[in-house]
Design a protein with these regions (language model features):
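RNase H catalytic domain
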Residues: 15-21, 59-153
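Alpha-helix boundary/interfacial micro-motifs
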Residues: 30-31, 93-95, 168-170
Length: 172
């Protein structure tokens, strides 16, 4: 991929472990500008999903990159393509059976009688941060052809495992 030297290229990936009751989620970024890696970041938390973590990290990145910039998020997670779409009543209250992004989450939420959320709180913050910039977009890339994307997933998975381990050590 040919890069424009004025654009910030933000490789972003996430990971979530639906198999644990404390369900850790994580996200990581590698930021390129002027053909150089200028920053790496990773976040994780318990009782969340990789999608919430990815949106949270997108907000942080858009806040930290200088105002008026061009930003392109590169990912294999189609979910975040809607980071700048105003939440509707339907998307904010999507039933778990309508969730197309995480069938495991849908099954899990459905079995507990809850609705899967479309993260309207984070989408609104993304929209606000996007307004500070000249342009912000998302490009879907192939995972196996993108070493920096693979790195983000690995770092998110490591952070998630560390968060879970610290939780269990603290609660022994």
């Amino acid at each position: 991929m040919t890069q424009d030297t004025s654009t910030y290229y933000v490789w972003i990936g996430g990971s979530c472990d639906y198999g644990h009751k404390e369900r850790a989620g994580g996200a990581a970024v590698v930021i390129e500008h002027n053909d150089n890696i200028i920053s790496r970041d990773v976040i994780s938390d318990l009782h969340t999903t990789e999608f919430r973590m990815m949106l949270t990290l997108m907000i942080k990145v858009m806040h930290e990159i200088p105002e008026g910039s061009d930003i392109l998020f590169l990912t294999n997670a189609a979910y975040i393509q809607n980071f700048d779409k105003t939440p509707t009543a339907k998307s904010a209250n999507r039933t778990s059976s309508e969730s197309k992004d995480a069938s495991l989450l849908a099954i899990s939420a459905e079995s507990r009688g809850r609705k899967a959320r479309a993260n309207p709180d984070l989408i609104i913050q993304c929209i606000e941060e996007k307004e500070r910039h000249n342009s912000v977009g998302v490009k879907i890339v192939q995972y196996h052809k993108s070493p920096l994307l693979i790195e983000t997933h690995d770092r998110a998975t490591e952070a998630m495992a560390k968060t879970r381990k610290e939780f269990h050590q603290k609660n022994k």
